[in-house]
């Protein structure tokens, strides 16, 4: 009897479902998305042609305008230069990536090669070879490069049709588009904008967390398509973050160029082999002197803050990372200085990775010490809607500005000087912290101690400018602590900058 009742209930439920909803919303969404995808695939030569792509070579070159990483917080901005050549063997999971870039105080010339699950990074400035950890040289890591070209994105969508969903119609660049989304093997959810007329992918979007405004869209825009054989290949490649142009490149793509094993070998005679960069840096507190601590890797990996104790309060220099990371840093500071309020938080410069935790310190009641030009960045950040402590406990930021390039905090126990040493090639306004009694400088992005055993290599333009300023100011530092990396001795710093003298 019980079995009959259960069967009857199941039949009634199924009958009601069929009558009320002959096809679920997810099924309808996937079915519509598949129709749109099939049209895009047909516009790019068809599924057979896309699956016949075995090798891709892509050259990108142009200007970069990295959001919250330029020399000034507001326009007009100075762009950087960038050139990249990517070679991917999709069948054998081989990759070679060459990049050259300049601007914002840094020059780079690197080559990455991955073959048979083993990879290395070749620093062509420092002439070093750094192994890539095995877990980062797997097929999974190749997936990100499928987002470089619309042809490879379509292949991925065809391989992941279960996650296809139709989002609707939208206008982009004055044209109607249908938008579908799918999930790639690296768990990134990608929204494809497919031109309703041509069937070509105009752009795709990812969602990222912006340190200034919270969740935003990252857009990769493809344009100026050219038909080459069966394929439509873009000749323009642009990245926008939060609506701002982040990179603008000319693109040159080749499908199935001839390759050999030598295509993935890197000539590196005379290069030094060094240890891999650790994938998980230890959270720790470094004591530079009584009441002077560098809180390392607590805000995030390779993200440090300086905490300086005074008689009645604590001053912090730098709030990197995120609100969650800053909450963890604040907890450590309270353990180091029980009963003392965090009265001040100073920032070295306006870049996003250096101010991502500022909202938590504002919520804590700390006054922000910065330059006049950087104040609007913090005001905008504090006003943004984010799911963090400041949203739950709203508070307007209070400011203490540098005057004539300096701000000094001092009582009977300690003296801390905040000095604007800009303009620096990395940022026009660049503040360092100087503890004269302890002979310690704390800085951000001006000098790095590698997290492995790699040599320093030729000094970067930002470091050369920093060394010159230290001499001009007569700061007799013995140690140079950093927002990124370990604390350096003055001997290390002098050795690394000797070629710049």
Name the predicted role of every residue range:
Residues 287-333, 430-449:
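Conserved beta-strand hairpin/beta-sheet module of binuclear metal-dependent hydrolase folds
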Residues 324-369, 472-476:
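Active-site metal-binding motif and surrounding structural segment of the metallo-beta-lactamase
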Residues 172-266, 431-436, 443-444, 449-450, ...:
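Gly/Pro-enriched, hydrophobic low-complexity segments
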Residues 467-501:
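Divalent-metal (often Zn2+) His-rich catalytic cores of metallo-beta-lactamase-fold enzymes
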């Amino acid at each position: 009897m019980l079995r009959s009742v259960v069967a009857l209930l199941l039949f009634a439920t199924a009958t009601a479902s069929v009558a009320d909803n002959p096809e679920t919303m997810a099924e309808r969404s996937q079915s519509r998305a598949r129709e749109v995808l099939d049209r895009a695939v047909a516009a790019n030569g068809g599924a057979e042609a896309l699956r016949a792509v075995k090798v891709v070579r892509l050259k990108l070159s142009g200007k970069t305008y990295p959001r919250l990483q330029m020399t000034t917080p507001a326009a007009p901005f100075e762009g950087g230069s960038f050139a990249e050549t990517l070679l991917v063997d999709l069948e054998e999971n081989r990759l070679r990536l060459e990049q050259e870039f300049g601007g914002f105080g840094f020059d780079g010339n690197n080559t990455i090669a991955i073959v048979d699950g083993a990879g290395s990074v070749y620093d062509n400035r420092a002439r070093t070879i750094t192994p890539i950890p095995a877990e980062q040289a797997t097929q999974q890591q190749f997936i990100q490069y499928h987002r470089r070209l619309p042809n490879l994105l379509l292949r991925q969508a065809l391989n992941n049709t279960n996650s296809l969903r139709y989002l609707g119609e939208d206008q982009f660049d004055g044209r109607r588009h249908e938008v579908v989304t799918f999930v790639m093997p690296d768990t990134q959810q990608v929204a494809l904008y497919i031109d309703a007329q041509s069937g070509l992918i105009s752009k795709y979007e990812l969602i990222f967390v912006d340190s200034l405004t919270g969740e935003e869209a990252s857009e990769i825009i493809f344009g100026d398509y050219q038909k080459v054989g069966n394929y439509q290949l873009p000749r323009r490649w642009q990245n926008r973050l939060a609506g701002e142009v982040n990179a603008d490149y000319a693109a040159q793509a080749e499908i199935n160029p001839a390759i050999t094993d030598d295509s993935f070998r890197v000539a590196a005679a005379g290069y030094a082999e060094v240890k891999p960069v650790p994938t998980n840096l230890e959270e720790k507190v470094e004591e530079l002197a009584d009441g002077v601590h560098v809180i390392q890797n607590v805000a995030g990996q390779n993200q440090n803050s300086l905490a300086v104790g005074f008689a009645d309060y604590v001053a912090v220099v730098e709030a990197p990372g995120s609100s969650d990371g800053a909450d963890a840093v604040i907890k450590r500071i309270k353990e180091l200085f029980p009963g003392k309020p965090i009265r001040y938080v100073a920032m070295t410069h306006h870049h996003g990775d250096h101010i991502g935790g500022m909202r938590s310190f504002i919520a804590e009641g700390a006054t922000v010490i910065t330059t006049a030009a950087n104040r609007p960045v913090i005001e905008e950040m504090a006003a943004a809607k984010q799911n963090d402590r400041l949203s739950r406990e709203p508070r307007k930021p209070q400011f203490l500005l540098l005057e004539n390039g300096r701000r000094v905090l001092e009582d009977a126990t300690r003296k801390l000087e905040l000095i604007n040493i800009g303009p620096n090639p990395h940022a026009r306004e660049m503040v360092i912290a100087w503890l004269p009694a302890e002979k310690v400088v704390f800085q951000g992005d001006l000098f790095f101690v590698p997290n492995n055993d790699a040599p320093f290599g030729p000094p970067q333009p930002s470091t050369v400018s920093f060394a010159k300023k230290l001499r001009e100011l007569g700061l007799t530092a013995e140690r140079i602590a950093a927002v990124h990396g370990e604390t350096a001795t003055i001997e290390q710093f002098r050795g690394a900058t000797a070629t710049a003298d």
